[in-house]
């Protein structure tokens, strides 16, 4: 009896693999294109945008240079538009699992990266823009919760209009929970903010605004913890059982938005033989290269003294990292800096696609 041998996974060869499709990863892709580098992007989420898309797409951002203010999702959309002329492939719902050293035909060092979906990338450099690492929202730990996810139980607000006319419970005590409770009160039929104690892990002005809204009868605030979720015969949410020192009560609800924060960890990259500091990658600030040749980090995942966790800092880090990555991709060529406005071919590509 003969069998057909299983073929080895196809290996994609490119200059740079960018791990993470958040704002920093998207800007890095644009920078790669400007420099003449080919790149591909891998992200554990199912779409581009990182935390901006997954957790707070409608949250205002005010600290991007030359952009007085925009929503987080708008920033992602603009970055996608900016890098679109280069048409870099993006691979979603998979994470970079392992890396090994290899060489190309001329003997120059390369890296072989494999994802948990079996994709393989032969690259000159890896730029990790994975934010806080692989992350997921902290989920409601009730047995009935899983069946309600995406229909009535949400871990992010992606569209305020989705909750129009609904009774909504927002659970959590951080800035995100308070911000969304305040925003939803203008759309939902009724909003109840649920937190386990009177104190909050949020900015003072946000807490004051919430308490003022409660005092004005615009929303409710309940101290307690989720003890159960109630559904009707169709499996739709009808209410939440809340436990407190005073006993139990049932709060009617059509939707529950649970904003307990994120569970994040570096994931497999922590085993990539790099100097790690508290789950982040230590880098040389002249190039943002890690302790392992050819692997760079930019954005929140990068560690160095006086590091500022700002999107604009990540843009700067990615730009410098890619200039060093260029020398790994083209070791026998010099990178000549040319302003995009003075490069006719590049200008044509960026303006007309």
Curated annotation (Swiss-Prot):
Gene Ontology molecular function: ferredoxin-NADP+ reductase activity; flavin adenine dinucleotide binding; NADP binding
Positions bound to FAD: 43, 51, 56, 96, 135, 300, 341
Top-level taxon of origin: Bacteria
EC number(s) on file: 1.18.1.2
Keyword annotations from UniProtKB, A to Z: FAD, Flavoprotein, NADP, Oxidoreductase
Pfam family, one: Pyr_redox_2
Catalytic activity: 2 reduced [2Fe-2S]-[ferredoxin] + NADP(+) + H(+) = 2 oxidized [2Fe-2S]-[ferredoxin] + NADPH
Cofactor: FAD
Cofactor descriptive note: Binds 1 FAD per subunit.
Record has NADP as a keyword: yes
Membrane-spanning ranges: none
This protein's record includes keyword rRNA-binding: no
InterPro entries membership: FAD/NAD-bd_sf, FAD/NAD-binding_dom, Fd--NADP_Rdtase_type_2, Ferredoxin-NADP_redctase_2
Family in the record: Belongs to the ferredoxin--NADP reductase type 2 family.
Assembly with partners or alone: Homodimer.
Name under which the protein is recorded: Ferredoxin--NADP reductase 1
Species this chain originates from: Cupriavidus metallidurans (strain ATCC 43123 / DSM 2839 / NBRC 102507 / CH34)
């Amino acid at each position: 009896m003969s069998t057909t041998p299983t073929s080895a996974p196809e290996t994609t060869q490119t200059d740079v693999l960018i791990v993470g499709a958040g704002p920093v990863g998207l800007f890095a892709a644009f920078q790669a294109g400007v420099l003449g580098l080919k790149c591909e992007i891998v992200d554990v989420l199912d779409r581009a945008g990182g935390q901006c898309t997954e957790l707070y797409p409608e949250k205002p951002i005010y600290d991007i240079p030359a952009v007085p203010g925009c929503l987080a999702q708008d920033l992602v959309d603009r970055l996608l538009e900016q890098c679109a002329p280069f048409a870099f492939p993006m691979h979603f719902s998979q994470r970079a699992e392992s890396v090994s050293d290899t060489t190309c035909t001329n003997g120059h060092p390369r890296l072989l990266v494999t994802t948990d979906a079996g994709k393989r990338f032969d690259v000159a450099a890896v730029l990790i823009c994975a934010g806080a690492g692989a992350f997921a929202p902290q989920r409601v730990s009730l047995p009935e919760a899983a069946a309600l996810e995406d229909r009535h139980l949400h871990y992010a607000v992606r569209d305020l209009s989705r909750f129009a006319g609904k009774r909504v419970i927002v659970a959590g005590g951080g800035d995100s929970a308070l911000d969304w409770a305040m925003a939803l009160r203008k759309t939902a039929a009724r909003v109840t903010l649920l937190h386990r104690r009177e104190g909050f892990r949020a900015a003072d002005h946000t807490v004051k605004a919430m308490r003022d809204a409660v005092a004005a009868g615009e929303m409710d605030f309940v101290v307690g913890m989720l003890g159960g979720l109630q559904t009707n015969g169709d499996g739709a949410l009808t209410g939440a059982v809340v436990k407190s020192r005073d006993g139990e009560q049932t709060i009617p609800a059509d939707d529950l938005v649970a904003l307990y924060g994120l569970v994040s960890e570096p994931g497999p990259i922590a085993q990539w033989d790099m100097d790690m500091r508290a789950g982040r990658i230590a880098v040389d600030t002249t190039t943002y290269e890690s302790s392992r040749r050819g692997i760079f980090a930019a954005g929140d995942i990068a560690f160095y003294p006086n590091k500022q966790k700002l999107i604009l800092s990540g843009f700067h880090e990615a730009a410098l990292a890619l200039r060093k990555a260029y020398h790994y991709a083209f070791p026998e060529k010099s990178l000549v800096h040319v302003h995009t406005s003075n490069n006719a071919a590049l200008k044509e590509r960026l303006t007309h696609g």
